[in-house]
């Protein structure tokens, strides 16, 4: 199967999460019984792409063998990229990362660009923590683009990219094959994988969590049992597909938060066959098996966990990716929206579609909010009054919504861009100022 970036893929997908996949676009392109034969079929080059240390435990080891027309080393030297440099990867105090305020923060959507702007040039870092160089923490980016990448290819050496489209489909042509995502779906592109993004709908906007640390995995289910939340079979990894093109192309690399570019005389999406467990994948959030209370109380939001990046402390993740999808609320004599909360973790939220059930207004699709460690947050005044008076003897369906959260164990530090942008809502705090005093010591 050869790649045509302008049309939907028809090579299909392979089902499963972190499976040992094997796929070939030409019959017999995968060597039989070995990884690196003296001569690979069709005159291809064998190349291993390692996502973990060679000696990582087998259950955590991630690598794939690629059989490609030219090795990845074939390109001209890199030089600093002359385009926009709006990405941050080190989150200590700096000109890019000012002191972090304890305020609750919320932003309007990133505006669509006026000038032609592709996926790479449309990226901007809003917040993050840790260090790409030290391989811990994450960066949270937004993207807004109106042009497909034209003879340009991109990869991040800093981390894996969890892409959450909010507007417009993305056709992502990768070394491993084609991944197509639309709003309500996510894509994960592993560290180092080269790709190009086509925008079939013209405009596109969304969110990215760039994970510097341990790779995303499915959470353990504990007493939920053997099924539930995001089921492994619903994750889709592309079949092999390649393009054999020569010409004047550009390869853009992200390393330590900076962009670099190199001339390359061929398309790097030239992998004819591959096998392994280190590969891009997609997931449809509408397939999430939501768990909730059928008696009383609103459970902790950990029941909405899709993917996690584990830390070295059991039970404490570096990153949790959580969603708030359509669901039934059936708890009786219970305040059903998310409750008021202060959290040792830090929470960056986005909205793909509809409205979030804890905010009556102000939090719109494409927008974002940040509630850092121990910053009080919760439903606004209107939501509290309505939910406190609602009839909880009848179930209620929260419909036409898809919100999500990147939750981290360490402080999420907004960038200078995020604190200075016109999209920052200076009046966000007002949504709680109308909360009334109901206390009466004479009436229980």
Curated annotation (Swiss-Prot):
DNA-binding is among the record's keywords: no
Keyword rRNA processing found: no
GO cellular component, as recorded: cytoplasm
Residue positions of the active site: 298
Annotated GO MF terms: homogentisate 1,2-dioxygenase activity; iron ion binding
Swiss-Prot/TrEMBL catalytic activity: homogentisate + O2 = 4-maleylacetoacetate + H(+)
Enzyme Commission number(s) of this protein: 1.13.11.5
Entry keyword set: Dioxygenase, Iron, Metal-binding, Oxidoreductase, Phenylalanine catabolism, Tyrosine catabolism
GO BP terms: L-phenylalanine catabolic process; tyrosine catabolic process
Binding locations of homogentisate: 356, 377
Pathway given in the UniProt record: Amino-acid degradation; L-phenylalanine degradation; acetoacetate and fumarate from L-phenylalanine: step 4/6
Record: residues binding Fe cation: 341, 347, 377
Pfam families: HgmA_C (PF04209), HgmA_N (PF20510)
Cofactor (UniProt): Fe cation
NCBIfam families in UniProt: hmgA
Family, per entry: Belongs to the homogentisate dioxygenase family.
The protein's assembly and partners: Hexamer; dimer of trimers.
Entries under PANTHER family matching the protein: HOMOGENTISATE 1,2-DIOXYGENASE
Its biological purpose: Involved in the catabolism of homogentisate (2,5-dihydroxyphenylacetate or 2,5-OH-PhAc), a central intermediate in the degradation of phenylalanine and tyrosine. Catalyzes the oxidative ring cleavage of the aromatic ring of homogentisate to yield maleylacetoacetate.
Descriptive protein name: Homogentisate 1,2-dioxygenase
Gene from which this protein is expressed: hmgA
